């Protein structure tokens, strides 16, 4: 029940994040607003004042608009990373587990990639390439598929030589058909679980790489940028809302994805359905 409630809330938050700019009365997240009477730029307006729902930052930008724009950016990065890791991981995992001739090659490739810290790769790519959404997606996806591929490979090894698969090979069924019809349907729950856990990990990586100054530029709202900006003013009691609101959104999204992923894993595990 908790997982279902979290799932409903998470879907609502994600849907609102992407629908928010199309709702009436929304403003540009990069617009620096000024007082219409005095013409002076707004600075650090408290939440609920001057029409700012969640307040403004030091240059008059609406935090309500920026936080939802940041959530869209971070979620977009996370969704693409999860999709790329799933496609590459499934492809490599199936070949690794089903085609015996490729086992040595993929095992050595796995050993090489697995011994290179993914954080180091992400930092190096972000440092060498210009900061952009595409750069972050590339850096996170470059080795992120390894865990998915290994998991798929292990599952393939378990079901590869079952009677119905051996029979299919004996009657000349194409390998591609065996994989699609006999193997992948058993892996749907595993794939969904891995993707659900990849999303919060990717969001966390975006926040981390932006926090150390190698992430997206300040012109692109992201949860990492917003938390980094809030950190700079957190010692001023009246400005802590600039850190509080993006942190709440980040915490909810990452924890919800993690708990839902674990609940989905438990529900899909046959051991939990034994009488």
What annotation goes with each model-predicted range?
Residues 10, 94, 123-127, 136, ...:
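Transmembrane alpha-helix boundary and packing residues in multipass membrane permease domains
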Residues 53, 84, 89, 94-98, ...:
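Generic hydrophobic transmembrane alpha-helix motif, especially the helices
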Residues 126-130, 156, 204-249:
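Glycine-rich helix-loop "coupling/hinge" segments at transmembrane-helix boundaries
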Residues 145, 149, 202, 253-257:
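Alpha-helical transmembrane segments
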Residues 79, 83, 87, 91, ...:
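Hydrophobic alpha-helical segments of membrane proteins
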Residues 8, 68, 80-84, 109, ...:
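Hydrophobic residues within alpha-helical transmembrane segments
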Residues 61-76, 80, 100-103, 107, ...:
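Amphipathic cytosolic juxtamembrane alpha-helices at the membrane-cytosol interface
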Residues 1-86, 90, 94, 101, ...:
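Gly/Trp-centered helix-boundary motif
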